[in-house]
Amino acid sequence: MFKYIGDIVKGTGTQLRSLVMVFGHGFRKRDTLQYPEEQVYLPPRYRGRIVLTRDPDGEERCVACNLCAVACPVGCISLQKAETEDGRWYPDFFRINFSRCIFCGLCEEACPTTAIQLTPDFEMADFKRQDLVYEKEDLLISGPGKNPDYNFYRVAGMAIGGKPKGSAQNEAEPINVKSLLP
């Protein structure tokens, strides 16, 4: 008999403790946001929409090395290389299927020219899957992105617009390798 009374007291205590917890949470600040009217806080390194950036000179940074497509775990990036008269590579087409993209950021890490960058833009919803396939024209932005002073071809040692090799920033004079032969 006393066992049953103990169970009743224990159950009543559990119920009262639950009610106190519910009423206590009723007066706390709400975590829910009215989304379109109230903007969501995004952390500083939030990975959202992928963009292609330009050099400080206004040229495309992408050199079509295909490292981003190889690094992508879901295979949503496709591109094809083309070459200008002066030997500079650029993507003939660059396509990202955002319906497959998981926004992991591996393409940004693999890019040697910092051409691919992830922005905090996340509002990309659409009614048709075909509209989530972005071409190069949709991805290119007019600015340099996160690294405004970086120019891959000035650092890589390729002659720029009539300047001889060795005159770019932090670049040593070219070495005549034939003089090193015995």
Curated annotation (Swiss-Prot):
Residue stretches spanning the membrane? none
Which amino acids does the record list as binding [4Fe-4S] cluster 1? C62, C65, C68, C111
Principal EC category: translocase
Binding annotation for [4Fe-4S] cluster 2: C72, C101, C104, C107
Under Pfam families, the record lists:
Fer4_7
Q: Which GO terms describe its molecular function?
A: 4 iron, 4 sulfur cluster binding; iron ion binding; NADH:ubiquinone reductase (non-electrogenic) activity; quinone binding
Q: Which cofactor does it need?
A: [4Fe-4S] cluster
Describe the reaction catalysed, as an equation: a quinone + NADH + 5 H(+)(in) = a quinol + NAD(+) + 4 H(+)(out)
- Subunit description: NDH-1 is composed of 13 different subunits. Subunits NuoA, H, J, K, L, M, N constitute the membrane sector of the complex.
Reported function: NDH-1 shuttles electrons from NADH, via FMN and iron-sulfur (Fe-S) centers, to quinones in the respiratory chain. The immediate electron acceptor for the enzyme in this species is believed to be ubiquinone. Couples the redox reaction to proton translocation (for every two electrons transferred, four hydrogen ions are translocated across the cytoplasmic membrane), and thus conserves the redox energy in a proton gradient.
Family designation: Belongs to the complex I 23 kDa subunit family.
Q: What is this protein called?
A: NADH-quinone oxidoreductase subunit I
Q: Record the organism.
A: Pseudomonas savastanoi pv. phaseolicola (strain 1448A / Race 6) (Pseudomonas syringae pv. phaseolicola (strain 1448A / Race 6))
